[in-house]
Each structure stands twice: as structure tokens, then as C-alpha cells.
């Protein structure tokens, strides 16, 4: 089954896993919980991730862009068939890679929890990293 793996503080990546319960439990590190994402895809995460203090990973937002939940620990994005989980289609894979492309950190601001994307820094070509102040 071709799935998207989303680990805390890392970019998401494709992985081929066995379609059984044990392989999904192995990937998320414990008992699994399925959360609907769209009509044809869902998130498989560690059911006790928050209780066990796993690192906060990505936010799930409602249709107004507000945080509805925060997933703790590694999670999978899988296709959802009639009765079973399924591989993501290539279009779904690209959609969810884009949706979860940036790791997030979380903080309380103005009485609400906000998600802050962690985007990679880029330097112009040829610019070197400075280790000492210029003299």
C-alpha cells in the first residue's frame, strides 16, 4: 500500500507498506486511530500520541482555516476505500505532500494555539554561511 508518512519536523515522504494492521501500528508507534481527512483519504495516527507525550507534528484545520486538532507523533495519510484502507492515488499523494510539506511548531498567542510553519532557509547561490563576524 503506497502511503504518505509525515514525521514531526520532517518533510513528508512516500512509502510502500503492507496493508495490514501491524504494519500501520509499526509506522505510528502504537495503537492506531483513523481520522477522516477527505471523502477518499484519512489519517492514521497513534491513538495515544498526546497522552504518551509524543512530539506535536502537524495541525489539521477546519474549512475556515482554524486549527481543529493537532496530531502528535508520526502519522500516515492513506486512501480510504469502501471497507479498507488503500493506496493513495498519484494525485492524492501530491495534494497531501503539498498540504503537509512544512513541519510546524505551536505556540499560544492571544488565547489561541497557532501553528507556525518551519520553512527551510535558502541562500542566494554563492553566498557562504558566516561563522565569524566580519572584521
Range-by-range predicted roles:
Residues 1-11, 15, 19-122:
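N-terminal nucleophile
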Residues 123-135:
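Non-Sec secretion/translocation targeting segments of pathogen effectors
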Amino acid at each position: 500500500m503506497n502511503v504518505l508518512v509525515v514525521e514531526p519536523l520532517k518533510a513528508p515522504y512516500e512509502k510502500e507498506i503492507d496493508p495490514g494492521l501491524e504494519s500501520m501500528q509499526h509506522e505510528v508507534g502504537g495503537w492506531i486511530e483513523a481520522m477522516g481527512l477527505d471523502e477518499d483519504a484519512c489519517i492514521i495516527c497513534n491513538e495515544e500520541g498526546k497522552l504518551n507525550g509524543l512530539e506535536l507534528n502537524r495541525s489539521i484545520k477546519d474549512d475556515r482555516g482554524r486549527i481543529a486538532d493537532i496530531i502528535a507523533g508520526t502519522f500516515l495519510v492513506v486512501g480510504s476505500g469502501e471497507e479498507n484502507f488503500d493506496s493513495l492515488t498519484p494525485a492524492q499523494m501530491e495534494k497531501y505532500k503539498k498540504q503537509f510539506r512544512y513541519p510546524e511548531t505551536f505556540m499560544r498567542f492571544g488565547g489561541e494555539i497557532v501553528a507556525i510553519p518551519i520553512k527551510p532557509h535558502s541562500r542566494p547561490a554563492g553566498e557562504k554561511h558566516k561563522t565569524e563576524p566580519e572584521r
